[in-house]
Amino acid sequence: MTIDISEESLSKESADLLKILLKDRTTKKSIVWATHSYELLGKGFAPSDRITPSRVTGTYANLIQPRSEKSKYEQKDRTKIRAEVFTPTWLVEKQNGYVEAELEAMDLEDYIQVSWLEITCGEAPYMVTRYDTVTGEEIPLSERVGFVDRKLQRISREVSDEVTFYELIKEVYRASYGYEYQGDSLLLARENLL
């Protein structure tokens, strides 16, 4: 079983959604590859080239994969060249748990509005733990430990009104930030937040 979210499927379900996921919020253009991993594919795949829907669908539909599904050689190469490492879920749980312990006494609305930033987020495991970034095993909703996951779990436990529920969900996303330079990892992070 794969934990990858198919860009091909995203494009078919909503071409606009894929374009949104590929948009650089600063330049208003598409995000760049920012990695040499794909440049052997030719024009359009250099580190400074922009990632367009046609570069991740069709012939290239399975090009971008989570780290756990990349070859060991590719994992090692990206670690060596870009210092790309991935934190195992048990460590994310422990570190986020320390912060969570400081926040658990807050009322729900204040808790939801606490801003969190995951810098150099990779696939964003500190935000959302859809799967273990090391093993690739999918993690059930109730066991996810990212800071967005924890906020969503608390809303699910404490809110029964549907309108309030959805408003608070939007607030969670408005208060959650991740920064990533490499375009493929950024796209994976954004997909994980869906």
Regions found by a protein language model. Name each.
Residues L91-K94, E102-L194:
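Conserved S-adenosyl-L-methionine
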Residues M1-S115, C121-A124, S176, R190, ...:
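Non-catalytic, mostly N-terminal accessory regions of nucleic-acid modification and defense proteins
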